[in-house]
Amino acid sequence: MSFSLQQIRSDFPVLTREVNGQPLAYLDSAASAQKPTAVIEAEAEFYRHGYAAVHRGIHTLSADATQRMEAVRTRAAQFINARLPEEIVFVRGTTEGINLVANSWGDSQLHAGDNLIVTAMEHHANIVPWQMLCARTGAELRVLPINQDGTLQLDKLPSLMDERTRLLAVTHVSNVLGTENPIADIIATAHQAGVKVLVDGAQAVMHHKVDVQALDCDFYLFSGHKLYGPTGIGILYAKEEILQAMPPWEGGGAMIATVSLTEGTTWAAAPWRFEAGTPNTGGIIALGAAMDYVDAIGLENIHDYERTLMAYVLRELQAVPDLQIYGPQERLGVIAFNLGKHHAYDVGSFLDNYGIAVRTGHHCAMPLMEFYGVPAMCRASLAMYNTEDEVDRLVAGLIRIHRLLG
């Protein structure tokens, strides 16, 4: 499929609706992307015609459902170029995946006197689990600072690492600033010091191709709902040798090999030992459909279109008086801003009256808000279905708000 904006927009039913009497301009895909018909129908079809509990079922529906679920594991491995399908764990989302790593790998590897590093631009999901881990183990949490332009102070990374540093947890793309970090270089620097690297890819995989083998990351995570897929499903990638050595985090059905009241329990092999209970099979199948949809359009095509649209919005926003934009000029997916002295919630409410959906608040990045000295920001985010006309409406709306509020 070539990149046809008209065709893409027709694939997303919600884009035809109106909000407050205006055509919807959905500029909040970084929070959660809209879903194409192919994804909606894939999940609906499974529940209409193919639903059954997976694993251990001898009947046809169960066997078929299991095969379809495991096919998506293989599909996910292909999507990020993992070496093996067994390096893919189905999780509820990026947040659960990071917590899984912190509670399984982290609890077994970190001890008092050890340390791990996060950056000042992380989403709370890549801060709080590590704070909790450090509180449990007595390890130290270190922070790699950022520059005023929203880039990392990478020159300070070597001095933060020592022989007791076990992990660097870093976002691929900032969910607030749109900063795309030089992940391959960061990973290489960390590995030279013997430090493993976890990458939060929640804001990256929908914008361009990710190759985990080329990056050489130890862990990589993303959520389905930001990739035009359903909520409640995500992917944790971990290198095979790391995953096989990790103990289970949650206990229950499907993650065991044997259970005995007298002899104890033995675990299933990875990745299944990390998938206790009945999985979100419908969501998994729909995530596979989302990957198929994105790949049919082509991530290179999507990246080229979105890069052009980002340049357009940054250029057009220069016409808005008293607009403060945060982050670097070169960015991916998101634009965070404030309008004069007005609170982000007020600006976002006015934009909603004009049919324009943006995100307002601290964006689960309170340390970043503190760094910039603001309680909140507005954030507009771009997806492959957004248009220059929607950008024009955003700009006109902000100019109108400035005139109304002063």
Curated annotation (Swiss-Prot):
Chief location bin: cytoplasm
Pfam families: Aminotran_5
Domain of life: Bacteria
This protein's record includes keyword Oxidoreductase: no
The protein's required cofactors: pyridoxal 5'-phosphate
GO cellular component, one term: cytoplasm
Catalytic activity: (sulfur carrier)-H + L-cysteine = (sulfur carrier)-SH + L-alanine; L-selenocysteine + AH2 = hydrogenselenide + L-alanine + A + H(+)
Compartments reported by the entry: Cytoplasm
Modified residues (N6-(pyridoxal phosphate)lysine): 226
EC number: 2.8.1.7, 4.4.1.16
Active site, per annotation: 364 (cysteine persulfide intermediate)
GO BP: any one term: cysteine metabolic process
A GO molecular-function descriptor: cysteine desulfurase activity
Keyword terms, alphabetized: Cytoplasm, Lyase, Pyridoxal phosphate, Transferase
Pathway: Cofactor biosynthesis; iron-sulfur cluster biosynthesis
CDD domains given in the database record: SufS_like
NCBIfam families: PRK09295.1, sufS
Subunit structure of this chain's protein: Homodimer. Interacts with SufE and the SufBCD complex composed of SufB, SufC and SufD. The interaction with SufE is required to mediate the direct transfer of the sulfur atom from the S-sulfanylcysteine.
Role: Cysteine desulfurases mobilize the sulfur from L-cysteine to yield L-alanine, an essential step in sulfur metabolism for biosynthesis of a variety of sulfur-containing biomolecules. Component of the suf operon, which is activated and required under specific conditions such as oxidative stress and iron limitation. Acts as a potent selenocysteine lyase in vitro, that mobilizes selenium from L-selenocysteine. Selenocysteine lyase activity is however unsure in vivo.
Family: Belongs to the class-V pyridoxal-phosphate-dependent aminotransferase family. Csd subfamily.
HAMAP family associated with the record: SufS_aminotrans_5
Protein's UniProt name: Cysteine desulfurase
Lineage of the species this protein comes from: Bacteria, Pseudomonadati, Pseudomonadota, Gammaproteobacteria, Enterobacterales
